[in-house]
Amino acid sequence: MKPDYDVLIIGSGFGGSVTALRLTEKGYRVGVLEAGRRFSDEEFAKTSWDLRKFLWAPRLGCYGIQRIHPLRNVMILAGAGVGGGSLNYANTLYVPPEPFFADQQWSHITDWRGELMPHYQQAQRMLGVVQNPTFTDADRIVKEVADEMGFGDTWVPTPVGVFFGPDGTKTPGKTVPDPYFGGAGPARTGCLECGCCMTGCRHGAKNTLVKNYLGLAESAGAQVIPMTTVKGFERRSDGLWEVRTVRTGSWLRRDRRTFTATQLVLAAGTWGTQHLLFKMRDRGRLPGLSKRLGVLTRTNSESIVGAATLKVNPDLDLTHGVAITSSIHPTADTHIEPVRYGKGSNAMGLLQTLMTDGSGPQGTDVPRWRQLLQTASQDPRGTIRMLNPRQWSERTVIALVMQHLDNSITTFTKRGKLGIRWYSSKQGHGEPNPTWIPIGNQVTRRIAAKIDGVAGGTWGELFNIPLTAHFLGGAVIGDDPEHGVIDPYHRVYGYPTLYVVDGAAISANLGVNPSLSIAAQAERAASLWPNKGETDRRPPQGEPYRRLAPIQPAHPVVPADAPGALRWLPIDPVSNAG
């Protein structure tokens, strides 16, 4: 029986979209299953208060782009929709510093910097990475704080995947023919710098995956099936993978479908991929899965805090610019970025409360809830105004704090009283996953003082549950199943026709925004696949790792003379954060 697809990909984010394009170019019949809906530019929410288009909560009739997932040790922000996290991410595309490549989990396998750099460079071109050209009010404030604290020389503008205009110009609102792919891609419109990147770009400036990898894959024959939630999968006796799905949000039997494929790629985002692997293991569908599943789950050692004024300052436009416009490095292992939402997008302000400190040498033994009450009692009216989400985006500088330290949590499933298995977490390998980052709080308090505002954290921090937008790992690369879930070619140990190609395969904390790394790892993984019908040069599982040369696709979509053409060259230093 002929399968529905040669390759079926679950998820359409950075890993899934890269894989879809490159394997379509190699002649495979590719299908992509996406739980979320498809958006045209004008269909994105005008503000984050349009919850049906912004928030992901299918049981409530909300099919937006913003997922929020709670875990015991962390609260997670993620993406949804055709294009995955590219729809609501902050456009920021850094190459990580050296500790990522040298992490003890995988550094002994190969020279990862040497192997991955050509693929980082290719992903940069595909995603249209340029240096942010605008120095905003938030950048000025952050730069002044960095200067005063002695690390002003670390301030840099961010590398972003945004179209500002042709040939390095800024032409806001002007539409031009495809500037990246020699006519194979869509027309693009110059960025308005309205700050609405994370609610969905309505202007055609953000280089989402729909504008590049995924859109090109579809034009070459890949089939994207939206509003399709995967309920389970298993390998049949004939070797094919059978994937059971239901129409997202439906409870009806008639909305169930089954797909078959020779090869199956999990790219459902770290949360989604981990959930599927745990579920299939617990139900006996993947009995040979490595016991390392869930180990080395990372949060990017992250904290999301911020500073807010009590009323809008007419002399400060904190919504101007793309979502993230600059970076500072207060310590060798800490990276802070100012973040913004556009005017009117204030719903995420409901996550904010007053800043509190955790325990430890630089902290306090006072419980965080008590700190909150003490601070609030000093200025009750000011606290109420600070917590009011009205005009929150116009009053707030969000501070995204990341580190490339070796800490992690371990995710696992446990059976509850009703026999239902629950997904949970605990502290993992290395140093404890931070519940707060002291230098992040210090910098944020300085920012608050600069704007005559109040420093804030998130409600989860009162219970030592930080917020992260970068949930990673848990199905990491190892040199055998005792040390990893997947091999260095991204094949799941024990199941060589099952792959993990998304954030779950990130094997160490990055200390920078992860999207470029996910794309680069996916580029490398797909480059090692043979063209359809040719001999697979990857060694069988169980044999020692061999470094292989990338295999050019037989049917490239992008013309060879276009900026985004597939070619492996040294990396552009603009986005090297090392």
From Swiss-Prot:
Gene3D superfamilies per UniProt: FAD/NAD(P)-binding domain (3.50.50.60)
Official protein name in the record: Cholesterol oxidase
GO BP: cholesterol catabolic process
Family affiliation: Belongs to the GMC oxidoreductase family.
Disruption phenotype: Mutants lacking choD, hsdD or both genes are able to grow in minimal media supplemented with cholesterol as a sole source of carbon and energy. Mutant lacking this gene is attenuated in peritoneal macrophages, lungs and spleens of mice. The deletion mutant shows less efficient intracellular replication in human macrophages. In contrast to wild-type strain, the mutant induces nitric oxide (NO) production in macrophages. It exhibits a significantly weakened ability to suppress reactive oxygen species (ROS) production by macrophages.
Main location group: secreted
Binding site for FAD: 15, 34, 85, 90, 230, 503
GO cellular component: extracellular region
InterPro entries named in the record: Cholesterol_Oxidase, FAD/NAD-bd_sf, GMC_OxRdtase_N, GMC_OxRtase_C
Source organism phylogeny: Bacteria, Bacillati, Actinomycetota, Actinomycetes, Mycobacteriales
Pathway: Steroid metabolism; cholesterol degradation
Needed cofactors: FAD
Nucleus as UniProt keyword: no
GO molecular function, one term: flavin adenine dinucleotide binding
Organism, as annotated: Mycobacterium tuberculosis (strain ATCC 25618 / H37Rv)
